[in-house]
């Protein structure tokens, strides 16, 4: 890794990437969901920083800055190369993943999409988001909410101390709840379908 290398991921993608990047001294930037945001940040930073890899939780991957969108061919090539390298070391790729979990912590992600069809579907989704925004939970599954990130208002808040801060990303209808146990729960309406998505 070089000092000017960077990794870019979306805000709903595993925080394990941030931790690995930090261990290698690489900057890791978080952007809104969608590869257009990754490509835009590459353009903003390319004069001073070198984009290495980026992606989002929906299995999209971008390697290098030549093709600024999801690149399944490059992803398959990288996975094949990783598999071959680990085989030479006498390991399965799965065993390498376990090694990474042991070194950086165990991470598990899950996505739940709720479809709200019909004339009232979109309204129901808007009401759900407004409810979470106006009456955020104090705890989730027994763990205190330590940060509430409202990307529509571009504000973050620690509900326990009252401390507030700005979020330096474009406005987007996304809420994130960061819990004391390290969990992160994100809620956002789908841009293309009558769905609300919850990322755990």
Which sequence ranges carry the predicted segments?
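Phosphate-binding and adjacent anionic-ligand microenvironments
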Residues: 3-188, 195-197
């Amino acid at each position: 890794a070089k000092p000017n290398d960077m990794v870019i991921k979306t805000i709903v993608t595993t925080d394990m990437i941030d931790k690995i990047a930090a261990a290698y001294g690489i900057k890791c930037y978080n952007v809104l969901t969608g590869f257009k945001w990754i490509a835009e940040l590459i353009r903003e930073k390319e004069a001073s920083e070198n984009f290495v890899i980026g992606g989002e939780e929906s299995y999209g991957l971008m390697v290098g800055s030549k093709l600024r969108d999801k690149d399944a061919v490059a992803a398959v090539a990288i996975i094949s190369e990783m598999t071959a390298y680990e085989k030479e070391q006498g390991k399965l790729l799965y065993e390498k993943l376990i090694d990474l979990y042991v070194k950086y912590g165990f991470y598990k992600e899950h996505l739940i999409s709720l479809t709200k069809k019909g004339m009232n579907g979109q309204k129901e989704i808007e009401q759900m988001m407004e409810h979470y925004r106006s009456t955020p939970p104090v705890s989730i599954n027994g763990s205190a909410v330590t940060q509430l990130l409202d990307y529509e208002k571009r504000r973050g808040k620690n509900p326990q101390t009252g401390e507030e801060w700005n979020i330096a990303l474009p406005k987007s209808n996304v809420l994130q709840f960061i819990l004391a146990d390290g969990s992160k729960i994100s809620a956002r309406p789908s841009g293309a379908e009558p769905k609300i998505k919850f990322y755990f």
